[in-house]
Amino acid sequence: MLSSAHVVPTSVRRAPSWICSSSRSFMDLKALLSSLNDFASLSFAESWDNVGLLVEPSPPHTVNTLFLTNDLTEEVMEEALQKKADLILSYHPPIFRPMKHITWKTWKERLVIRALENRVAIYSPHTAYDAAPQGVNSWLAKGLGTCTTRPIHPSKAPNYPTEGTHRLEFSANHSQDLDKVMSAVKGVGGVSVTSFPARCDGEEQTRVSLNCTQKALMQVLAFLSQDRQLYQKTEILSLEKPLLLHTGMGRLCTLDESVSLATMIERIKRHLKLPHLRLALGVGRTLESPVKVVALCAGSGGSVLQGVEADLYLTGEMSHHDVLDAASKGINVILCEHSNTERGFLSDLQEMLGVHLENKINIILSETDRDPLRVV
């Protein structure tokens, strides 16, 4: 069972959006990227995502000003250049699909051109920050009230706990040429071997356990298959990377005390600083219906929230049919528009990175970045 994190709403001291101090020093880009990865590992990102350093000026490149934005539009790029940014941290990756050419034809190509011409690097964390324990989804959960949270889809550790991806085990009695077997498997690269005495069917035997890579597994099996009796006793286990506590996509939040849906709506509006949001009432639900469990996912949460049992789904956007499906099950759905469930995190990020980077560089927030959709 996964451990849970207890979320208590807190007031965070806000730094001005444009901090500029001549006492700040520079950081080498590579050193800064290493620190950013220490803050939230890019290994947390989804496999389909495009994260990390997307645009790099010719080295050496030093950073005095880090510019934070949710979306890097041409308007935001102009602001970043005016404020002398050396590195733009854009939550959403401005380069996602492969580019076949870099011309002045499209706005995303123009972003790359302007960045390189002005020696500005571009970095995107995206789903790595969604999954991180101190990331976007945890920030979104702060607006619900005091609650216990856990990831809906926990992340896996980047590495296996032991060498190899598979474990192969077999038992051999002393009448078999065990020394020959052990010598052969130890000679295969990518294999670690342990052995210990074991009693099987009333007979003293030796239990052999091998951790192997996929490639080594096939080599070991090819050797063991030469001994029919030994091969038939061989067990193969596929190893899994361990789950990471408090890290993963979405959050399932259990409130310490139930509140009405109407109260929850006001809390979310206040947290996201929104005058309006979109609501789909679950079948049989009203604004006075109690809310105890909230499943949330910043951005587009349809796939993450699908099938999760909760009183309320909170996300930026979902497809029409996903909303209908949730409502039919009595689940209320609140949609706030995609980036409105993400952008507010940047203020917390500004302060957290300031501490993490020991205030070595200027960290400023975009003032022109905004959700493209408006209620009219």
UniProtKB/Swiss-Prot annotation:
Modification Phosphoserine, positions: 258
InterPro entries according to UniProt: DUF34/NIF3, DUF34/NIF3_animal, DUF34/NIF3_sf
Entry's Gene Ontology BP terms: negative regulation of transcription by RNA polymerase II; neuron differentiation; positive regulation of DNA-templated transcription
Disulfide bond sites: none
Location(s), subcellular: Cytoplasm; Nucleus
Protein task: May function as a transcriptional corepressor through its interaction with COPS2, negatively regulating the expression of genes involved in neuronal differentiation.
Phosphothreonine PTM sites in chain numbering: 254
Highest taxon listed in the record's lineage: Eukaryota
Residue positions where N6-acetyllysine is found in the record: 108
Keyword Iron-sulfur: no
Protein's name according to its UniProt entry: NIF3-like protein 1
Cross-referenced Gene3D superfamilies: NIF3 (NGG1p interacting factor 3)-like
GO-annotated molecular function: identical protein binding; RNA polymerase II-specific DNA-binding transcription factor binding
Organism, scientific name: Rattus norvegicus (Rat)
Matching Pfam families: DUF34_NIF3
Record-level GO cellular component terms: cytoplasm; mitochondrion; nucleus
Region feature (Mediates interaction with COPS2): 243-376
Family in the record: Belongs to the GTP cyclohydrolase I type 2/NIF3 family.
Keywords: Acetylation, Cytoplasm, Nucleus, Phosphoprotein
The protein's assembly and partners: Homodimer. Interacts with COPS2. Interacts with THOC7.
Name of the gene: Nif3l1
